[in-house]
Design a protein with these regions (language model features):
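Alpha/beta catalytic barrel-like cores
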Residues: 7-127, 136-139, 144-147, 158-165
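Eukaryote-skewed repeat-based solenoidal scaffolds used as protein-protein interaction platforms
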Residues: 147-194
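Conserved, mostly hydrophobic/aromatic
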Residues: 131
Length: 194
């Protein structure tokens, strides 16, 4: 069932009665344009350029992360109110987490809010997904590309693990690009298997 709604200048359609037993569920991909247009804006992809991290310090970066995660909670609540049961999370939740050029930081400061996201995912039966970028190429013949891919996929998996600790495990999934075949399909498949 489709419902037409208007919020301010925005007109949107809600698909109602989403549930586990439906083969296809539509959802939001990283950004809610209605919430983003609010003042202050609600969005979960705040970033910092490396120079800003160096100048302002890792604590400024962590504050961006916490605001991203607080806004994920807000978006999940909005999704629940509007019958949306699938929500793709932005890969930018933790800027530079897998970037070797930026000082390492851990997830400890964000553990509680990640658990809260997991609890909401479970309570709302809201599927949370990550879809790491196309530059993640598990089958690449280049060692450096493969290592960076592993680092980035580990980042995404770690975030989903923390969400799962909060109860969202059955609803937390990662979708990975298969990538190219690099001129030798069998060798690429073997690299994937390794």
């Amino acid at each position: 069932m489709l419902t037409q709604n208007i919020l301010g200048n925005f007109k949107y359609t809600v698909i109602c009665n989403m549930s586990d037993n439906k083969p296809i569920q539509l959802g939001l991909c990283c950004l809610n344009t209605i919430l983003r247009a609010q003042k202050p804006p609600v969005f979960a992809s705040r970033k910092m350029i490396i120079r800003s991290v160096e100048e302002q310090g890792i604590d400024a970066l962590k504050e961006k992360v916490l605001q991203n995660l607080r806004d994920v909670v807000t978006m999940m609540d909005w999704n629940e109110q509007h019958g949306i049961k699938v929500f793709r999370l932005s890969s930018e939740l933790f800027p530079h987490m897998s970037n070797p050029k930026v000082e390492n930081y851990t997830y400890d400061f964000a553990r509680d809010i990640l658990h809260e996201i997991g609890e909401r995912s479970n309570r709302y039966n809201q599927r949370l997904t990550f879809h790491p970028g196309q530059y993640n190429v598990v089958g690449s013949p280049k060692a450096e590309a493969f290592e960076q891919t592993c680092s980035d996929l580990k980042y995404h998996a770690d975030v989903l693990d923390f969400i799962s600790e909060g109860g969202g495990g059955k609803n937390a999934v990662m979708v990975v690009h298969g990538g190219g075949i690099y001129g030798d399909k069998e060798a690429t498949i073997n690299r994937w298997c390794e």
